[in-house]
Amino acid sequence: MTRTIQLDETIDVQRPLHEVFAYISEFSRIEEWDPAVARGVRSTEGPLGVGSQFRIDMKAGFSLRYSVVEWEPERRLLMTVDSKPFTAREEIFFKRTADGTRVRYVANFDFVAPLARLAEMFPGVMDRVGKSAMAGMKRALEDRFDPPRSVWGTVLADKLVVPGVLGFTRFGYRSARRHWNPV
């Protein structure tokens, strides 16, 4: 038994079409805008396009494998998604507007049993997941983040030099990364 759920969400952002397409098509950056994603990694080399693949690790503990199957620069992306709990076809449309870009995301998820039964019982869960991801995408693309504030610990570490050097290590990178915003 399988159950198909379709998501269809649209956002408008005040950003040029070429920038929006470049940002979203580099799908390894999904962790910057989808709160359900722990990490995105590009699995293939070379220019982005048909055949590009990405491994997306979800916070729920499973991974997705995205494959780009159709690529129309600044117009459309079509990707297939393979994972244990579901398969999907995700299509993202891009359209220039008077003051920026419209992004439309259409996905068809096919859940396998027993998740198919859960999807029937709680149909709004996937809808909330889609809305949350698109809200995150809009936030990331609009890039209206407050500048970072200095905190006493960082200021003191920088003045004492040696503790400040820790910020330039792998430990410093990892701890600072939690506070970064998408570009």
Language-model features: locations:
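Hydrophobic ligand-binding cavity/cleft-lining segments
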Residues: 1-45, 156-183
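Terminal "cap-and-tail" regions of soluble proteins that handle hydrophobic small molecules
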Residues: 2-4, 97-183
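Generic recognition of short, well-ordered alpha-helical interface segments
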Residues: 15, 63, 128-132
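Amphipathic alpha-helical protein-protein interaction surfaces
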Residues: 16, 26-29, 73, 99, ...
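Hydrophobic-ligand binding "helix-grip"
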Residues: 31-32, 46, 55-104, 108-113, ...
